[in-house]
Amino acid sequence: MSSLTNPNIFTVSRLNSEVRLLLENQLGIVWLVGEISNFSAPVSGHWYFTLKDSMAQVKCAMFRGNNRLVSFKPTNGNQVLVKARLSLYEPRGDYQLIIESMQPEGDGRLQQQFDALKMKLASEGLFAQSSKQAIPEHPKCVGIITSKTGAALYDILDVLKRRDPSLPVVIYPTLVQGEEAAIQIAQAIGRANSRNECDVLIVGRGGGSLEDLWCFNNEIVARTIAASQIPIISAVGHEIDVTIADFVADLRAPTPSAAAELVSRDNSHKDQALMSREQKLRAAWRHYLTEQNRTIVSLSHRLEKQHPRYRLMRQTQQADELQIRLQRAMEKYLAQREQKVSRVQHKLQLLSPVRQISEQKNALARVEQKMMDAMDRKLLRLRHQIAIAAEKLDTVSPLATLKRGYSITQSESGDVITRQSQIKTGDTLVTRLSDGEIRSTVN
């Protein structure tokens, strides 16, 4: 059966197309923190790079229409926070991210610190439910640890005044933002425990950015909350704001006003029922809005994918890929030609007459040196043989006999006198000794 008529059999191109649509339509927008590597900016103006961390990496493309809005020029090694869509480069089947915006890592770094501290404290059991203290059902005195000029304090006081005007309140003022805020918050909690005049504490502030709320993600504050003998309700920011203090506290309230409601008596059960219904309605409405927004985003993405501009981007990316491959092929070809030329040059050097003459000169010099060495050894042997022969001649030499005390007598003409009959009266005789001669006359 043909693959074109069987709906259960895919071609490769169809499979890649289906996977791309699945990635783009189902997952939508993602935020990602990572380090840039393999950064490339072809003449088309698009950017191609890899985002990585210590464990994994993913290929990314940022088209010219988006990257021209980036306020800095990325380089390898940059830590960045990106907003991206998941996609698939169909010709190669490569999963990739299409980057829509990029900025240097800031909040991403704080989030990593947040996650690291959260994991550390959780491993020590500071978040365990078994270590939580029960919040008094009807507190006799409420302590408030927050800024004395912040809106959070007035929100708490307004709720307490409306719900339980007779409830005593003690305020422990402190900074709730800045470098010194964490130390002051911890000191205020310690001061409340030392004075021991309240049976529940509310620690919090109004909403703000991640940096504004960062003092409530401080390890000192977290450990001070965990060590408090008085139950603590955290009430930091809005409902969507979550801090380390929320995990360590005995109870988390979504807002300072909600914390005030938790510690105050409600004089009207009807108000409670109404509030419960209101909360359910708000939750249902938020859920409905979220689903509708998700549907709108999905439909807008589908419409965007059908736009000719998107097809042009994919074709441009493919052209960039072909350009890169062509450049690599040319570089490889040139490198091979250079190697071949180098080998030919080496062979020519080996066959060069100048080189051969130089080698023959060196060989002749070595032979000449060997001949000189052989002549020196031959002369040495001859000198040794002559010395031995001289010793032998010296042994039989007349002079050697004279040295042993003998003498030789000769006539004046030089004949050796060996018999008495060779001389007569009046002859002059020469007697040779080892150190000279004696002349005498025969009487």
Swiss-Prot record:
Q: Which GO terms describe its molecular function?
A: exodeoxyribonuclease VII activity; nucleic acid binding
What EC number(s) does its UniProt record assign? Answer: 3.1.11.6
Q: List the GO cellular component terms.
A: cytoplasm; exodeoxyribonuclease VII complex
Q: CDD domains in the record, alphabetically?
A: ExoVII_LU_OBF
Q: Does the keyword Nucleus apply?
A: no
| Cystine residue pairs | none
Query: Where's it found, cell-wise?
Result: Cytoplasm
Is Plastid there in the keyword field?
no
- Keyword terms: Cytoplasm, Exonuclease, Hydrolase, Nuclease
Among the GO biological process terms of this entry, one is:
DNA catabolic process
Q: Which domain of life is it from?
A: Bacteria
Q: Enumerate the InterPro entries for this protein.
A: Exonuc_VII_L, Exonuc_VII_lsu_C, OB-fold_nuc-bd_dom
- Catalytic activity annotation: Exonucleolytic cleavage in either 5'- to 3'- or 3'- to 5'-direction to yield nucleoside 5'-phosphates
Q: Which NCBIfam families match?
A: xseA
Outline the subunit composition: Heterooligomer composed of large and small subunits.
Q: Which family does it belong to?
A: Belongs to the XseA family.
What role is this protein assigned? Bidirectionally degrades single-stranded DNA into large acid-insoluble oligonucleotides, which are then degraded further into small acid-soluble oligonucleotides.
UniProt name for this protein: Exodeoxyribonuclease 7 large subunit
What gene does this protein come from? xseA
